[in-house]
Amino acid sequence: MNVTRKPLSELRRPERNVRMHTDKQLKEFRRSIEMFGQIRPIVVDEDGVILAGNGLYETLLSMGRTEADCYVVTGLTEAQKKKLMLADNRVFDLGVDDLSALDAFVLELKDDLDIPGYEEDLLRAMVMEADEAADTLSEYGTIDEGRIEEIRDARERTEAREE
């Protein structure tokens, strides 16, 4: 991928953009850029028209930035450019969060939950719920898999005798 640095003044918004960016989203874009820098390039055609990354572009402008990392896509027809714009906005929406992975990350990061795109209070509540669940489980102790099998076998024998 050929990423190049371009002045924002050379980039142009597309005629239409299917994604509307809320103030909340732009605020979170800003927090992410402040925390990590620009981690994704803006995708533009050979004329500087933005094909993907309009929200990032808006955020960089509002931050007073004058340049951005850009990936220049060349040789696409107008129809292909429109398809790229639609696909970029839709494909991400088709995924779902792996809640167990999210829980694991949140527990690992529980001392610093300032994460762009997430409400810190919600993440703290998730940590508290996990801690409370662990406390509750510890009150009852643990049973190993062998003991669970013994209990199942005993129940099955009892049910068989009752038949």
Over which residues does each language-model region extend?
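Aromatic/glycine/proline-enriched transmembrane-helix motif characteristic
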Residues: 1-163
